[in-house]
């Protein structure tokens, strides 16, 4: 289990360069891609090819827009089998059409809806190799103007789904007679878990929770190769 910080946004240039290289390779019928490093290291390139047996079954939360959409695109670009969920149906359908990924409209704060989504995917794929817990919202406001309901809403979207998806995958793996030797859960954290600012109590608490939860999950889920 690993955590991804907001550096993903700063890596966008690297991703766009790799995407452009892939499109060029498709245009000229090449089978290998040139992986371009970030701007400060553009002089260093390497050839990357992806073996067929390394394709994975990937589930991403909050994949319709922004960072989530870029994650969906990247996994699809690498030839993986991808499913994602999002509450925004219009953007979700557009991303699914553009990438070929499977889209599920889900409000992740609804425990039953999120669990049903994962159960549907598990029934179709038999297992999930990679989960990316990306979904998240932020609301920065004075603590005197932030209601308890506002605080709870942020945690129900940012933090609780990390536990729900991880727990469900563990339950599924525990039932399998032959354990899957591969498993990864990537949780999107933030520098705000440690470097907060006024009015960010809900967001900071959710990201701090993800940071701590990831450590605990890493110990608990290692039994099932996650």
Spans of features found by a protein language model:
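Residue(s) in the substrate-gating loop at a strand-loop-helix junction
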Residues: 190
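Conserved glycine-rich Rossmann-like NAD(P)H-binding loop of the short-chain dehydrogenase/reductase
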Residues: 78-93
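Active-site helix of classical SDR
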Residues: 166, 206, 214
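Canonical Rossmann dinucleotide-binding motif of NAD(H)/NADP(H)-dependent dehydrogenases/reductases
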Residues: 53-81, 217
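Substrate-binding pocket helix/loop in short-chain dehydrogenase/reductase
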Residues: 142-143, 147-155
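Alpha-helical segment proximal to the catalytic Tyr-Lys
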Residues: 171, 219-223
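Active-site loop-to-helix junction immediately N-terminal to the catalytic Tyr of the SDR YXXXK motif
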Residues: 146, 195-204, 216
């Amino acid at each position: 289990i690993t955590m991804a910080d907001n550096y993903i946004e700063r890596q966008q240039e690297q991703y766009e360069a790799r995407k452009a290289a892939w499109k060029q390779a498709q245009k000229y019928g090449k089978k290998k891609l040139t992986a371009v490093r970030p701007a400060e290291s553009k002089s260093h390139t390497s050839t990357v090819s992806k073996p067929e047996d390394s394709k994975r079954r990937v589930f991403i939360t909050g994949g319709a827009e922004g960072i989530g959409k870029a994650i969906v695109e990247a996994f699809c670009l690498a030839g993986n089998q991808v499913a994602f969920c999002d509450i925004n149906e219009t953007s979700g359908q557009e991303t699914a059409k553009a990438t070929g990924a499977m889209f599920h409209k889900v409000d992740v704060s609804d425990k039953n809806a999120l669990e049903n989504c994962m159960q549907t995917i598990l029934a179709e794929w038999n297992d999930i190799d990679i989960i990316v817990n990306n979904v998240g919202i932020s609301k920065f406001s004075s603590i005197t103007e932030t209601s308890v309901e506002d605080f709870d809403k942020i945690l129900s979207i940012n933090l609780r789904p990390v536990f729900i998806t991880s727990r469900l995958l563990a339950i599924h793996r525990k039932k399998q007679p032959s354990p899957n030797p591969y498993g990864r859960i990537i949780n999107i954290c933030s520098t705000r878990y440690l470097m907060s600012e006024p009015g960010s109590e809900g967001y900071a608490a959710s990201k701090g929770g993800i940071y701590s939860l990831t450590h605990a999950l890493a110990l608990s889920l290692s039994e099932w190769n996650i």
